[in-house]
Amino acid sequence: MPTHQCHIIRAVPVVRYVVALLHWLLWRVVVIIAISVPVFHHPFRNLRPCHFRPSWVCNRILRTSSFPMVLPSQHRALPSHQHQHYANLLPIHFTS
């Protein structure tokens, strides 16, 4: 019986390490998905892509050539009483 308890005590740091590794991998996947989701499918499509994101994410977004960008001249807020479909929002211009 004491040998089993010894194995359990030795396994606790390994379990903590595995849980921390899984948490880190899950967080990386969430970050990659958040970066790769284009603004076109995002509810805040009419805002600039850098609005809710840190600067390094913004720089990565601006470096991708096919990422949809809304020009600042078309940046306008829709009236809150109009519940329009996302497809009826502002036009998307692809920067070269």
Swiss-Prot record:
Compartment annotation: Membrane
GO cellular component, one term: membrane
TM helices/strands, residue ranges: 13-35
Top-level division of the source organism's lineage: Archaea
Membrane topology category: Single-pass membrane protein
Entry keywords, A to Z: Membrane, Transmembrane, Transmembrane helix
Protein name: Uncharacterized protein AF_0189
Annotated organism of origin: Archaeoglobus fulgidus (strain ATCC 49558 / DSM 4304 / JCM 9628 / NBRC 100126 / VC-16)
